[in-house]
Amino acid sequence: MSDPLSDIEWRVEPGQVQYRTALDAMDARNAAIAAGDARELIWLLEHPPVYTAGTSANAAELLDPRFEVVEAGRGGRYTYHGPGQRVGYALLDLRKRGKDVRRFVHAIEDWVIATLRTFGVESWSVDGRVGIWTKDIDGAEAKIGAIGVRVRRWVTMHGFSVNLDPDLSHFAGIVPCGIDEFGVTSLARLGISLAPEEWDAALQGRAGQFLAQLEGEPL
């Protein structure tokens, strides 16, 4: 059986990457993939504290811009990235995967949900409410992961973030993804101590299922 990742670069960044640097790198790689000059890429990394604005961002939801605010070009509204949060960028060519953006988003969601389940965390997506959700320590529903994508020339950009152990107070500077009636949580808040390497390995272990789902197979 062939390795589903054999034609895809799997890159794990050892240190923090400035958000603008990552954005420029994604733009260049997107163009190269679309032109047939580069392999597809799944990129795992961490950013210094930053607020990013999606194409639907509402300035009223930027409550306290204590960190740099960067226009991301992805769909969605404001989100926060910072230390303790694992970010995954997927630059994949949908021209050979049915050109189905909705299926791509659902596959990303299911990939994150399946990986969280590895560590005993049940999570879910909700129609009309962007993100990955779980039950917080007080029993209330809270966001543990964010989803935001862009597709240009049928090549995807951006992807997801999952809260391993970020400073959750940093989310108070925005209304995360425009949803103010729910809180934000993390694996650490749920009592699970997890190194980024452990998360990355579990995610990679489910990458084949994620790619199969992009081909139209159920996860």
Curated annotation (Swiss-Prot):
Q: Which residues form a coiled coil?
A: none
CDD domains membership: LipB
**In the UniProt record, what gene is named as encoding this protein?**
lipB
Q: Which family does it belong to?
A: Belongs to the LipB family.
Q: What is this protein called?
A: Octanoyltransferase
| InterPro entries reported in the protein's UniProt record | aa-tRNA-synth_II/BPL/LPL, BPL_LPL_catalytic, Octanoyltransferase, Octanoyltransferase_CS
Q: Where is this site: Lowers pKa of active site Cys?
A: 143
Q: What is its EC number?
A: 2.3.1.181
Q: Which GO terms describe its molecular function?
A: lipoyl(octanoyl) transferase activity
The residues that cross the membrane are none
Please state every residue range assigned to the domain named BPL/LPL catalytic: 36-215
Which species is this record about?
A: Erythrobacter litoralis (strain HTCC2594)
